[in-house]
From Swiss-Prot:
Similarity comment: Belongs to the class I-like SAM-binding methyltransferase superfamily. mRNA cap 0 methyltransferase family.
Matches recorded under Gene3D superfamilies: Vaccinia Virus protein VP39
Lineage of the species this protein comes from: Eukaryota, Fungi, Dikarya, Ascomycota, Pezizomycotina
Catalytic activity: a 5'-end (5'-triphosphoguanosine)-ribonucleoside in mRNA + S-adenosyl-L-methionine = a 5'-end (N(7)-methyl 5'-triphosphoguanosine)-ribonucleoside in mRNA + S-adenosyl-L-homocysteine
Top-rank taxon, per record: Eukaryota
EC code: 2.1.1.56
Protein's UniProt keywords contain Methyltransferase: yes
Region (Disordered): 1-92, 333-365
Protein name per the record: mRNA cap guanine-N(7) methyltransferase
Transmembrane regions: none
């Protein structure tokens, strides 16, 4: 039948070409002659006839190619020399020693802080009448108060302030180390009206007494102090005051609400807002216990001041201290020289050795000390031969002032080192005088001269100075200063 396959014809055998084109999943791969298919033409498998997958064998690593690991003989010592081990031990011991010394120093500093705080908390408040009549150092008290009034009168006003004109801007004052509030009356009589006064001190009892003094002034209608420039005016409106127990040298003051409200700029270029004046009278020397404290103090000052604000204060005179220390050391050198020259002959003429039980003990070298019946300065340890304190921190001495200070530890403030350090915080020196120089320059001022009479520094009729030579010597232990924030 043309065009079709004969039904009786046997199936054709496949040639080689057809075998090569057979798909890879043919029955030859699974060991069966033919692969059954379903109606759709898909392959079907008999699971029982499938062979399991062959397990893959890993190739073995060649043996003997890598060198065997060299084992350390038990008990063998590391390849470190005895000198290295000794140096390591010495470094460890040195670290331990430094850690002990640091801990001891921290403990001593805390003890000193506690001593100072306890001392000022314990000083009784005797009242103005006692200070004017019964105090043995009433002349010194009056003189120092007049000096502080001079500094406040001269440097608390803004540069563009015009005396005698009311209604001008008021100033904001931060008093670090305010103590019992002894300067509240002086600020009430400041040439430029004070709007806000913030007093801080680490001694809690002193802060309580400052609050009491402020309440007393408030009850008197703001009267306090003895007047200053324009002292003939009536009593001004009493300024607002806040008091806080705070160590302004050992910790930041920016956590105090009123400080943040006024404005605190911690950056070097701040100064848009802040206080007009920061005052530190007879207290800043405590900051020079360590460099860390001195810098913290200056950070607080610079952060609290606005640009153009003033830092005023009074501190011990480092020039006087250096001179006294140098003179003491020169005397000690001369004394040792004389002892050495006379020592051999005096011992040979004794005629024999020391008696049984006696010891020839070397003479203990005296530390630097000076003063009079009113005040005394004593260094507990060795001082620099040339009187120059290097480094400028941590030079402790004990200070005594009759009726006021009982052997309290204080610290030298080397003036040039302080001035240079202040420049790092944009504080530029404007004025620096000893108390004697201040008296000589301001005693005849048309305002400050009469103020000295009202404050009983000199006699109103005769002009005689009502301060003894001993009190003047004690007063000249101090200097006043003023810095501007630039």
């Amino acid at each position: 039948m043309a065009g079709g396959a004969d039904l009786d014809e046997p199936p054709r055998q496949s040639d080689s070409t057809t075998d090569r084109k057979r798909p890879a999943d043919s029955t030859h791969e699974i060991g069966s002659a033919d692969v059954p298919r379903d109606r759709a033409g898909n392959k079907t498998y008999d699971i029982s006839k499938l062979e399991p997958a062959r397990k893959r064998q890993r190739s073995k690593s060649p043996s003997g190619e890598a060198a065997p690991r060299k084992l350390k003989r038990p008990g063998a010592r590391a390849t470190i020399s005895e000198a290295d081990r000794k140096a390591a031990r010495e470094r460890a011991l040195e670290r331990e020693r430094l850690a002990r010394e640091a801990a001891t120093a921290d403990e001593e500093r805390q003890q000193i802080n506690d001593v100072v705080k306890a001392h000022y908390n314990a000083v009784p408040e005797r009242g103005r009448d006692w200070r004017k009549t019964d105090s043995r150092i009433k002349g010194l008290r009056s003189f120092n108060n007049w000096i502080k009034s001079c500094i406040i009168q001269k440097f608390s006003p803004d540069e563009d302030h015009q005396p005698g004109r009311g209604g001008g801007p008021s100033i904001l004052v931060l008093d670090m180390g305010c103590g019992k509030g002894g300067d509240l009356g002086k600020w009430q009589q400041a040439p430029q009206h004070v709007e806000l006064y913030v007093g801080m001190d680490p001694a809690d009892v002193s802060i309580d007494q400052a609050r009491d003094r402020y309440r007393s002034m408030s009850s008197r209608g703001g009267r306090g102090g003895r007047g200053g420039r324009g002292g003939g005016r009536g009593p001004a409106r009493l300024f607002e005051a806040r008091f806080h127990v705070k160590d302004c040298f050992g910790e930041p003051i920016s956590d105090i609400d009123i400080i943040r409200q006024v404005g605190f700029e911690s950056g070097p270029h701040g100064g848009g807002r802040g206080f007009d004046v920061v005052s530190m009278m007879f207290c800043m020397h405590y900051a020079f216990e360590t460099e860390q404290k001195a810098r913290q103090m200056l950070k607080n000052v610079a952060g609290a001041l606005r640009k153009g604000g003033r830092l005023i204060g009074a501190i011990p005179n480092s020039d006087v201290i250096s001179t006294k220390v140098r003179e003491h050391n020169e005397r000690m050198v001369e004394m040792k020289k004389k002892q050495a020259e006379a020592g051999d002959g005096s011992k040979k003429d004794d005629g024999g050795d020391a008696e049984e039980g006696e010891l020839d003990e070397p003479e203990v070298e005296k530390s630097a000390e000076w003063g009079n019946d009113i005040y005394r300065v004593r260094f507990p340890g060795k001082t620099p031969e040339d009187g120059i304190f290097r480094p400028p921190f941590g030079w402790k001495y004990n200070f005594f002032l009759h009726e006021a200070v009982e052997e309290v530890p204080e610290y030298v403030v080397p003036w040039e080192a302080f001035r240079a350090l202040a420049e790092d915080y944009n504080l530029e020196l404007q004025w620096h005088r000893s108390f004697k120089e201040i008296w000589d320059q301001e005693k005849d001022d048309r305002t400050l001269g009469p103020l000295s009479e009202r404050m009983h520094v000199r006699d109103r009729n005769t002009g005689e100075l009502l301060v003894s030579p001993e009190e003047l010597e004690a007063a000249n232990f101090y200097v006043g200063f003023c810095f501007y924030k630039v």
